[in-house]
Amino acid sequence: MKAKVLKSKIANRLKRKRRIRAKISGCASLPRVSVFRSNRYLSVQAINDATATTLTSLSSKATGHKANKEGGAALGAAFAAKLKEVGISQIVFDRNGYQYHGVIAAFGDALRENEIKF
């Protein structure tokens, strides 16, 4: 991919990210779950925006999964268990400007299957 095209794709994702973040916010009882996807790994964290603290986080690098649909689903199930340990059953999902398909959708579906509402 040419550098100019790559820069515009990244700039467009960051614009989408800012639009999304202007509309959603998390608190202690309803945290924002932010997803970051790289080519190799997937990272997620539950954030309380009122105090700007991370409640819990998990990465596919730590769990040994890859950033594909199967890895996203496994990470979603593991993160749902971690959220339940902290006592969280409902979240606000922040897809971070990524399209809701593929690995991001697999992660979200795994959260829903494990009774996390968003």
UniProtKB/Swiss-Prot annotation:
Q: Which residues form a coiled coil?
A: none
Q: Mind listing the GO biological process terms from this record? A: translation
Q: Which HAMAP family match?
A: Ribosomal_uL18_B
Q: Name one GO cellular component term.
A: cytosolic large ribosomal subunit
Explain the purpose of this protein. Answer: This is one of the proteins that bind and probably mediate the attachment of the 5S RNA into the large ribosomal subunit, where it forms part of the central protuberance.
Q: List the disulfide bonds.
A: none
The keyword Chloroplast is annotated on this UniProt entry: no
Task: Identify the keywords attached in UniProt to this record, alphabetized.
Answer: Ribonucleoprotein, Ribosomal protein, RNA-binding, rRNA-binding
Organism annotation = Sulfurimonas denitrificans (strain ATCC 33889 / DSM 1251)
Q: How does it assemble?
A: Part of the 50S ribosomal subunit; part of the 5S rRNA/L5/L18/L25 subcomplex. Contacts the 5S and 23S rRNAs.
Instruction: State the similarity comment.
Output: Belongs to the universal ribosomal protein uL18 family.
* Pfam families, per the entry: Ribosomal_L18p
A single MF term (Gene Ontology): 5S rRNA binding
Q: Which CDD domains does its entry note?
A: Ribosomal_L18_L5e
Q: What is this protein called?
A: Large ribosomal subunit protein uL18
